[in-house]
């Protein structure tokens, strides 16, 4: 962790040494929107895209069925890099911008007035918007993603909101997440009286949080380092060697090569396209994508046993809302949080294959069961639908515009799961796991339950925003 003061000094030096950067210039229009095929290879840092494996299942509510509840758990929209991500990007930018020779090969575009995509450190951690984008034509801002999502949500689920126009939207107190929730609320229109319930990510929140990992002292990002370190990173060496051979004296390292992938992804968020992305070969993108899958799988997914307990906190609450749907006036439940919290939730819900681990020996293709970017691109959204068909009710999940059936329970209409069978399934998923006990939450909080869905109208949640 870089201390804030040291980071600010280093960042100031790097920016002062870099080329002058005019904000909001017009780009080559032909380039904007031309790199969508790269999004799945950038580990969830690039702009939103729909879940590729849609199985051909229509997302419409099955004919003859009536929707009775929908829950949405969403990620913040497209953003600038975090401070830790930016540190690595600025280090490689410093080397490149201070290179005194003519750029050759893959970096030759830098000879043509290239503009760096982070003009000011105040943008770090922030959502990309129409105001702060480096290019005024950028179609991938987090702001517009959230607003577009809201209009699509209203078109599909608006009938459930007609009789309950006063409702909350739940968000963590991360500013970019709060901003996403606010943009979403604004785009729903003025026909609703919406209150943003802002929940602290501080560990003292215990179980009453949308960011359970922050309240889990036992979570350890290094728990599976021995596994992760065994994956070959020769592809990074190949990138740095190639760029150094083309530009003698540049002296990029393997770490710099890794940072170029982040540069590529976040520049897409801020600019709508990225020349840096064109540096990589198809094979290098595949290797990088798989490495991000590995890291995520063994840190925040099925490859780390504790994750099922962390995700149980939110999954248990969502199941409870489904059970109570007939007795609750509110039929639409909207929540916004971080990517890792969504991955934890999906892991516990069983929507991610946990029957086999990912190998570090090679990139598997036929048996590649976990794609981080597919589940949590910027602006990711997971819907839980409950609908009634004749006298029976059913539950199913929609992840990033695609129905993702429960593998062991999908015989209902639209490949849904019959309600009673779903509760048995959920009980089995939660058997033997306890967020509070497995995480030793008592070390940081006395809050043993997630209550905000039920007490928001009597307990006002208004945690101060933090830029993280």
From Swiss-Prot:
Which EC class heads this enzyme's classification? Answer: hydrolase
Q: Which UniProt keywords apply?
A: Glycoprotein, Hydrolase, Signal
A single GO BP? invasive growth in response to glucose limitation
Q: Which Gene3D superfamilies match?
A: Phosphoglycerate mutase-like
Query: Would I find Glycoprotein among this entry's keywords?
Result: yes
Can you tell me which residues are glycosylated?
Answer: 98, 163, 193, 202, 238, 251, 316, 357, 391, 457, 462
Alphabetical list of InterPro entries matching this protein: Acid_Pase_AS (IPR033379), His_Pase_clade-2 (IPR000560), His_PPase_superfam (IPR029033), Histidine_acid_Pase_euk (IPR016274)
Q: Does the keyword Cell membrane apply?
A: no
Kindly state which reaction or reactions the protein catalyses: a phosphate monoester + H2O = an alcohol + phosphate
Signal peptide position in this chain? 1-20
Q: Which GO terms describe its molecular function?
A: acid phosphatase activity
SUPFAM superfamilies in the record: Phosphoglycerate mutase-like
What does the record give as the active site? 76 (nucleophile), 339 (proton donor)
CDD domains listed in its UniProt record:
HP_HAP_like
Q: What is its EC number?
A: 3.1.3.2
> What GO CC terms are in its UniProt record?
cell periphery; fungal-type cell wall
So what family is this one in? Belongs to the histidine acid phosphatase family.
**PANTHER family per the UniProt record, alphabetical:** ACID PHOSPHATASE PHO11-RELATED, MULTIPLE INOSITOL POLYPHOSPHATE PHOSPHATASE-RELATED
Q: What is this protein called?
A: Probable acid phosphatase DIA3
Organism, by scientific name, is: Saccharomyces cerevisiae (strain ATCC 204508 / S288c)
Identify the coding gene: DIA3
């Amino acid at each position: 962790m870089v201390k804030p003061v040291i980071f600010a000094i280093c960042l100031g030096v790097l920016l002062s040494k870099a080329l002058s950067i005019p904000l909001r210039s017009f780009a080559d229009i032909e380039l904007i929107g031309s790199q969508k095929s790269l999004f799945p290879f950038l580990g969830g840092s690039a702009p939103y895209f729909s879940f590729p494996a849609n199985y051909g299942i229509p997302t419409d509510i099955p004919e003859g069925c009536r929707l009775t509840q929908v829950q949405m758990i969403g990620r913040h929209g497209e953003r600038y890099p975090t401070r830790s991500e930016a540190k690595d990007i600025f280090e490689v930018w410093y080397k490149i911008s201070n290179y005194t020779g003519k750029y050759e090969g893959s970096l030759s575009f830098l000879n043509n007035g290239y503009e760096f995509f982070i003009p000011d450190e105040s943008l770090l951690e922030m959502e990309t918007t129409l105001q702060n984008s480096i290019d005024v034509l950028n179609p991938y801002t987090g702001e517009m993603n959230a607003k577009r999502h809201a209009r699509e949500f209203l078109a599909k689920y608006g009938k459930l909101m007609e009789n309950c126009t006063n409702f909350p939207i739940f968000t963590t107190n991360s500013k970019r997440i709060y901003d996403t929730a606010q943009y979403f609320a604004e785009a729903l229109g003025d026909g609703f009286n919406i209150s943003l319930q802002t929940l602290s990510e501080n560990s003292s929140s215990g179980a009453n949080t949308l960011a359970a990992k922050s309240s889990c002292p036992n979570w350890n990002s290094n728990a599976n380092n021995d596994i992760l370190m065994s994956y070959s990173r020769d592809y990074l060496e190949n990138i740095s060697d190639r760029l150094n051979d083309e530009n003698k004296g540049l002296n990029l390292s393997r770490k710099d090569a890794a940072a170029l992938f982040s540069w590529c992804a976040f520049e897409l968020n801020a600019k709508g396209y990225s020349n840096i992305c064109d540096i990589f070969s198809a094979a290098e993108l595949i290797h990088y994508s798989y490495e991000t899958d590995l890291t995520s799988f063994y840190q925040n997914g099925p490859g780390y046993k504790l994750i099922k307990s962390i995700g149980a906190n939110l999954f248990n609450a969502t199941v409870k809302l489904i059970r109570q749907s007939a007795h609750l006036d509110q039929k639409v439940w909207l929540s916004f949080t971080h990517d890792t919290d969504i991955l934890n939730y999906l892991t516990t819900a069983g929507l991610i294959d946990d029957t086999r681990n990912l190998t570090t020996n090679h990139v598997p293709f036929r048996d590649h069961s976990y794609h981080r970017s597919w589940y949590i691109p910027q602006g990711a959204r997971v819907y839980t639908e409950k609908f009634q068909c004749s006298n029976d009710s059913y539950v199913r999940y929609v992840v990033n515009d695609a129905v993702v059936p429960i593998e062991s329970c999908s015989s209902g209409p639209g490949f849904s799961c019959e309600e009673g069978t779903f509760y048995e399934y959920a009980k089995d998923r939660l058997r033997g796991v306890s967020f509070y006990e497995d995480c030793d939450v008592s070390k940081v909080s006395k809050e043993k339950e997630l209550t905000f869905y039920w007490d928001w109208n009597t307990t006002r949640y208004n945690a101060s925003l933090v830029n993280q």
